Structure formats: structure tokens, C-alpha cells
Curated annotation (Swiss-Prot):
InterPro entries given in the database record: Glyco_trans_1, GS/SS, Starch_synth_cat_dom
One Gene Ontology molecular-function label: alpha-1,4-glucan glucosyltransferase (UDP-glucose donor) activity
Reactions listed under catalytic activity: [(1->4)-alpha-D-glucosyl](n) + ADP-alpha-D-glucose = [(1->4)-alpha-D-glucosyl](n+1) + ADP + H(+)
Organism of provenance: Synechococcus sp. (strain JA-3-3Ab) (Cyanobacteria bacterium Yellowstone A-Prime)
Keyword Nucleotide-binding: no
Top enzyme class: transferase
Protein name: Glycogen synthase 1
NCBIfam families documented for this protein: glgA (TIGR02095), PRK00654.2-1 (NF001902), PRK00654.2-4 (NF001905)
Length: 491
């Protein structure tokens, strides 16, 4: 099959979060399976040009219809770790992608509405006719709308769209100006409850809702999160829309790239290891202590790696630090705050605990250090308030770092409680799970993990081995997506 991914991110060249990893990992898996995959991305001024090989002009004179006129664009082509990528650069006074950032501009809705239009215009004018167009999150929610309302009448009638929602919280909103700009000129038609009109605000268009309504198939990033979105509180107002389109909605668990996250070959850790050579994990633990100036004592290391925000359960992350110390464990935190107040809170904790030889708080993100923490820590806490998929716990399992997670979203699909999970046999369980968002719930799981490390080291090692035996690569998700592609291709 010929597959084109249209997205706002692709790691490592454009990466603001997990979306970039997913777009790259899925593309790579599809190519390994023998399919032709190309990516269409914005040409941001801040993307990592050092990660692109052979960047050159591919289409110099792309004129994208916009507000009754047209904006001139250049399309550049280059290879990102073997993936063929096209980068769209508009030449206009709006400077849509020359802002010094990927997201966070007041006109993000207009920026990505233009990108969606430009991506389809590029496919049309360059005579690219993929079997499948796979687009991601609200930034490309208008792609299926534009394809089936405009471009199918210009020679793109045979293309099918798979639309993946990575986070329902961010949906993308706009007013009538979006319709005027993109050429969707029938305002009363699109401002209808079963098309683009937002379910709560009758004066707003909802990009994500448009993606759901007009695409051929909709996925989200784990089976449990699909259920939460359909029946729970994590759809942020799109529950009824998902109900109307439940026949084409499914959760597909993300994978992780084992060429990057693999203790057997990881270039960022000093000692490689497997489930059969876990003694080398202990050597990485010592290396981690030496680098972070933790005291070299016989204690478990509990770690947290990720954003510091409400979604990630930041109040429980904070409590995990002090609970670990109370249970005679060490704690390592690597995280970046998205809100100034949370950043100031953890900066204060860093200063307060600076002289404690059992704690290290590293604010910001450090790719190399994250690998060493996964390899050196014994326990990984993931106390998310909600978690559509989560990659952290999958990486932890691969590195033999026992996850302690809250039972939501993709965490439910990947971590099985050692003591209580009835879905798996005892020899298939791989971590600890709690369900409520209070401190006592976290303690109930974290204490069991630390106690097992102290009282039954052989059983703790066996739990590590069981976690490392799980395959959370892109192998199975790639197969699922190909089944979806084949299904919609012949509809």
C-alpha cells in the first residue's frame, strides 16, 4: 500500500511530545512490512535540521487557495532516519511556521487549518494518490473534511482517511473565518451538530469533531482509553459524536521503538543487559548514583520521568518523593513543568532537598539522562490523572524497572498488578496498580513494590524478568493499523 502520514510532528526532527514518536515509529513499522510510506509536515523554523538528510526543494511553486486568493509555498524533501518527508513552507506575512515554536500561538487554529489545506493541495498538484491518508490529532482534523468536501471532486476520490486522536483534551476550535479561508463556503451546512459545530459552543467549529465525522476510520491510542472516551469523562464533550460513529472507532495501543529503547543496545547507558544478565542493571544503578551524587547504599531507587502537570498527577509525584524517603528508598525525578506555578513548586523542592543524599530532582529534559534512569532505577511511578496511552511504563518494563501506575487508559492495557490482577496468570504480571487519585492509593501500590524489593529480592527480580518479556514494540500495532487500512480501502 501507498500510505501518507500528515502530522504536525515527527521525531526526532519535530518533537513536542509523544505524538512525534508515534508518527515516526508507526511509519517505520509500516515500511518494514513492505509498504511505501511518506510524511507531510510543516517546515518549522525551530525543527532539528541536523536530523534531516539531503534536504532540497521538491516543489517550488505550490499555490494554496486561501481566502479567495492563494498563498505561495515551497515544499522541501528530505530523509529522516530513512523516512521520506515533505516539509511545507508558506511564504506569507503570517509566517505560520516561523514563530520560534511548534504550538502555543493565538492563531494555532488558522496555522494548522492552512497546513491541512496545503498538505492536500501538495498531494493533488504533485499527482500523489495514496491508498491511505493517516492524520493525527486536532491539527490535521480538517484533512478529511477538505478531502471529501473539496478535493475528491478534483481527482482524489479514491483516497481513504484514518484519523488518530492522541489526546481528546486539545480539540482545535475556530469560527466562520476558518470556512472562508479554506474554501468550505457553505456556512450553515458545516455549522450543524452532525458536522463541524462544537457540541457545547454553537458558534464554534471543532477540528477534532470534523476529523471524527468525515474520516473513514477513527482510532485512539489504547483500547481502554477508547472505552473511557466513549463512556467516561475523558472525551471532553465529544462523547455523543463518538457514539454516533462508534462503528468506525477503535483503540489501538501505541508501541515504542526498540531500536532506541532497548537495554541490549542502548548507546546512552554504560552497561548493556538482558533479562538473563540483570546484574548489569545493578552496574547502571551505581553509574546513575555516581552521576547524580546519590549515596551508594543498599536501597531501591524510585524514579519519575515525564511532564510535571495535572494530567500526569503532579500532586502524587510530589507525594511519591517523600513516601519513598519514608520507606527508606531513594528518589530520582526528571521532569519539565508546563505551568510556571508547578515549575516554581518543584524548584523549591529541589532547593529544599538539595542536601539530601537520597534525592535528585532534575528539572527540564535530558534525553541521555532519561536512558540512564530507566536502566538504573528499580521502580518507576506513573500516577497519571488520565493517560491515553503512555510510553513511559512500556519503556520501564523493557528496562526491568517495575512500574507503579494508576489504572487509567493505556496503563491498564500494559501493566498488570502482581498481587491482584485476575486478567493474567501470576507469572505474567509485571507491576503494581492503584486506582484512586489520593495519597493513600499511591502508597498502597508503592509500598508493596518497595517492600518486595527489601523482603523478597528473588521475587522482585522475577517480576522484572516478567516485565521484560512483554513485547510493546510496533509489531502488533502495525499489524492492527494495516488491518484497518485494508478494511477502509475496500469500502
Amino acid at each position: 500500500m501507498y500510505i501518507v502520514q500528515i502530522a504536525s510532528e515527527c521525531a526526532p526532527v519535530i518533537k513536542a511530545g509523544g505524538l512525534g514518536d508515534v508518527v515516526y515509529g508507526l511509519s517505520r513499522e509500516l515500511e518494514v512490512r513492505g509498504h511505501c510510506v511518506e510524511l507531510v509536515l510543516p517546515k518549522y523554523d525551530t525543527m532539528r535540521y541536523d536530523q534531516i538528510w539531503g534536504l532540497h526543494d521538491a516543489y517550488r511553486d505550490l499555490w494554496v487557495p486561501w481566502y479567495g486568493g492563494a498563498i505561495h509555498c515551497s515544499v522541501y524533501c528530505g530523509w529522516v532516519h530513512g523516512r521520506l518527508c515533505f516539509f511545507i513552507e508558506p511564504h506569507s506575512g503570517d509566517n505560520f511556521f516561523n514563530r520560534g515554536c511548534y504550538y502555543g500561538c493565538p492563531d494555532d487554529n488558522m496555522r494548522f487549518a492552512f497546513f491541512s489545506k496545503a498538505a492536500l493541495e501538495f498531494l493533488l498538484k504533485s499527482n500523489k494518490r495514496p491508498d491511505i491518508i493517516h492524520c493525527h490529532d486536532w491539527q490535521t482534523g480538517l484533512v478529511p473534511v477538505l478531502l471529501f468536501e473539496i478535493y475528491k471532486y478534483h481527482g482524489m476520490e479514491n483516497q481513504r482517511v484514518c484519523y488518530t486522536i492522541h489526546n481528546f483534551k486539545h480539540q482545535g476550535f475556530g469560527g466562520p473565518e476558518i470556512l472562508w479561508a479554506t474554501g468550505l463556503n457553505r456556512e450553515p451546512y458545516y455549522f450543524h451538530y452532525d458536522r463541524l459545530r462544537d457540541n457545547f459552543n454553537p458558534f464554534a467549529l471543532n477540528f477534532m469533531k470534523g476529523g471524527i465525522v468525515f474520516s473513514n476510520f477513527v482510532t485512539t491510542v489504547s483500547p481502554t482509553h477508547a472505552l473511557e472516551a466513549r463512556f467516561g469523562n475523558y472525551n471532553y464533550g465529544l462523547g455523543h459524536t463518538l457514539y454516533l460513529h462508534q462503528h468506525k472507532f477503535r483503540g489501538v495501543l501505541n508501541g515504542i521503538d526498540y531500536d532506541i529503547w532497548n537495554p541490549e543496545i542502548d548507546r546512552f547507558i554504560p552497561f548493556h543487559y538482558t533479562a538473563q544478565t540483570l546484574e548489569n542493571k545493578a552496574k547502571n544503578k551505581k553509574a546513575l548514583r555516581d552521576q547524580l551524587w546519590l549515596q551508594d547504599v543498599d536501597k531501591p531507587i524510585v524514579a519519575y520521568i515525564g511532564r510535571l502537570d495535572e494530567q500526569k498527577g503532579v500532586h502524587l509525584v510530589h507525594h511519591a518523593i517523600y513516601r519513598s524517603l519514608f520507606k527508606n528508598a531513594q528518589f530520582v525525578l526528571l521532569g519539565s513543568a508546563t505551568e510556571p506555578g508547578i515549575g516554581a513548586w518543584f524548584a523549591h523542592e529541589k532547593r529544599y532537598l538539595n542536601d539530601n543524599p537520597d534525592v535528585h530532582i532534575e528539572l527540564g529534559f535530558n534525553e541521555e539522562l532519561s536512558h540512564l534512569i530507566y536502566a538504573g532505577a528499580d521502580i518507576l511511578v506513573v500516577p497519571s490523572h488520565y493517560e491515553p496511552c503512555g510510553l513511559t511504563q512500556m519503556i520501564g518494563l523493557k528496562y526491568g524497572t517495575v512500574p507503579v501506575v494508576r489504572g487509567v487508559g493505556g496503563l491498564v492495557d500494559t501493566v498488570f498488578d502482581r498481587d491482584y490482577d485476575t486478567r493474567k496468570l501470576p507469572e505474567q504480571r509485571n507491576g503494581y496498580v492503584f486506582y484512586h487519585t489520593d495519597r493513600a492509593a499511591l502508597e498502597s501500590a508503592l509500598d508493596r513494590a518497595i517492600d518486595l524489593w527489601y523482603t523478597a529480592p528473588d521475587q522482585f527480580r522475577q517480576l522484572q524478568v516478567q516485565g521484560m518479556s512483554y513485547d510493546y514494540s510496533w509489531n502488533y500495532p502495525g499489524k492492527e493499523y494495516l488491518e484497518i487500512y485494508e478494511f477502509i480501502r475496500h469500502r
